[in-house]
Structure formats: structure tokens, C-alpha cells
Amino acid sequence: MSNEVINVLITGAAGQIAYSLIFNVCKGDMFGLDQRIKLHLLDIPQMVDSLKGIVMEIQDGAYPLIADTVITADVKEAFTGVHYAILVGAMPRREGMERADLLKANAAIFKVQGKALAEHANKNVKVLVVGNPANTNALIAQVSANGIPKENFTCLTRLDQNRAKSQIALKAGVNVKDVHNVIIWGNHSSTQYPDYRCGYINLSTGKTPISTAIKDEKWLQGEFISTVQKRGAAVIAARKLSSAASAAKAITDHMHDWVLGTAEGEYVSMGVYSDGSYGVPEGLIFSFPVKCANGKYTIVQGLQMDDLSKNLINLTTEELVAEKTTALQFLSE
């Protein structure tokens, strides 16, 4: 077991997603089975007693990887010295709230957290934003965090990728572990583009393109895409609560692969700072296919685009540009 202890911050730590996520971290699913961790758990003041109960459960679980815990409602205390920041907490969209109102409320939150990262966190802190609208919240945090590399800011689209892989596996009648390189492009919203074209399935006959294994182009270009785009809303309709355990699993997958690396030839989807790849404007947090090694990601280059893909990527790009414009206006107020 490593003697080095890493400091890991989870915001919104008393919430549903965090309740599943915290124990994934404790078990070593995120950073490996020999990495000791000091957990920083942040929530609003009225939730601190709930955090105390979670720490009791961590203690009662006797997790050998947990070196220490910090529970706090103080931003400075929470962000001090953190190596990894998982920003789950955000203002939820309430009934009757316009999207602009949601962007304004969250711009204020993530401006504060971006500044806190710059002032108190480790200078190479790696940041994953989960709270929605995740792409634009991540951008606000990045813009507000002077001195921290922009490539250190990411947002979660791995849940969408996992949903897409699962739909392909169900349609093909295979185990989800045999489905590879399904991509999510763009925004973590209903405009996202789930892309099967570069994906393949490991069948008994060998590596098989998804379009060959599933001979149903109408489904692949229609129902598959819309099912993944609307899956979050479908979970809420059925459960009366948003996705929690599946979101925690996706957060764990995202951080694990970013820190420990992806398998050879494997693509994963991450919302990252656009460098102009695939015609996406620079300065957006946009979901791309990436490969990870040595704690860094690189955007997969050279993938071919058909007309459908170009159109769907343009749609989600337009939405992100509009979100960015609105959010930055609020920042300047």
C-alpha cells in the first residue's frame, strides 16, 4: 500500500449520488487498491449532521484505504490541498425555472468553486464536474480558476456512454463488457450525440463492428440515439428521483480511467476543453472520445464523419455556445 495520501474532495457530499460514490472511493474502485485517501466532504451547513453519519459508516466499514476524513460546510477548508475535486453539488432545476435561471444560479456557485480551486487546491488538481448543466458549469469553474491548466477541467459524460453501451448490449444480446468504443459527443443534455459508428462487439467470431452485429440501421440511427438522449428523464419518470447509483459508477469509471489509464485501443467519453478538434470551437467543454495514459487524456483524432454525425454535432455545439454566452454574461455582472 502506498504511503502517499491523496486528498479527494466531493461536493454535494450528503446527496444521493455522493452516498453511492463515497463508498466506491473507499473500496479503491476509483484510484486503485493501494492508494490511501483523505476524503474531503463538503455540503451546505444544514447537511453537516448527515455527513457525520456518513463518516460513521466509513468508520464502521473499516476501509483500510481511508487515512482521514474532513467534513465541512466551509469552502476554504474543503478545497485546501485537494488533488482531485469531484464537484457533484449544484443548484437543481426547479419547477417553473427557466434554463437561463438555472445557468445564472450555477454560474455563481461554480465561480466561487473555481476561485477556491485556484486559491486553495493543489496547483495540478484534476477536476470532474457532475452537477448540471455539467459542461457549462465546468467551463465556469475553469474560467474562474486562474493558474490551473484548462485541460484539468472535465465534466461527466461517462454515464451517457455507459447507457449507450448497455443499449447496444441489450439489442445485440451480449454482455456489456464485450461492447467497445461507443462515443458520446457534445453536451450532457438531450442534444448529446451517442455514436456507434466506431464501436465494435467482441463476438465468438471475433471483433465485429456494431453496424455488422446489429443489422438494424433504422434502430441505430433512431431509437438508439433518442433512448440514450432521454434516458435521464426516463429514470426520473420511473423512480421519481434522478440517477444516483449509475451516476456514481460513471464518476468512478471516469476518474479511474483518467488517473490509471485506458486499455490499449479503448476510447472513453469525457467532457474536456475543446482544442478545435472536429470543428468544435475552442473554449467549450465538449464530450469527445479520448484515450488516457499517465494521468492525462488525449482526444482521439481522425475519426470519419458522415452527414448525420456532422449535423448532430453541430446541434449540440450550438446549444453549448448558447449556454456559454448566457453563463459568461452572468459572470461579468
Swiss-Prot record:
* Any Pfam family matching the protein: Ldh_1_N
Q: Which residues cross the membrane?
A: none
What is this protein identified as?
A: Probable malate dehydrogenase 3
Enzyme Commission code:
1.1.1.37
- Enumerate the InterPro entries for this protein: L-lactate/malate_DH, Lactate/malate_DH_C, Lactate/malate_DH_N, Lactate_DH/Glyco_Ohase_4_C, Malate_DH_AS, Malate_DH_NAD-dep_euk, Malate_DH_type2, NAD(P)-bd_dom_sf
Q: How does it assemble?
A: Homodimer.
Keywords per UniProt? NAD, Oxidoreductase, Tricarboxylic acid cycle
Describe the task this protein carries out: Catalyzes the reversible oxidation of malate to oxaloacetate.
Which BP terms in the Gene Ontology apply to this protein? Answer: malate metabolic process; NADH metabolic process; oxaloacetate metabolic process; tricarboxylic acid cycle
Recorded superkingdom:
Eukaryota
This entry's Gene Ontology molecular function terms read: L-malate dehydrogenase (NAD+) activity
**Where substrate is bound, by residue?**
R93, R99, N132, R163
Q: Which reaction does it catalyse?
A: (S)-malate + NAD(+) = oxaloacetate + NADH + H(+)
Q: What is the main EC category here?
A: oxidoreductase
Active site at which residues?
Answer: H188 (proton acceptor)
Which family would the database say this protein is a member of?
Answer: Belongs to the LDH/MDH superfamily. MDH type 2 family.
Binding positions for NAD(+)? G12, A13, A14, G15, Q16, I17, A18, N106, Q113, V130, G131, N132
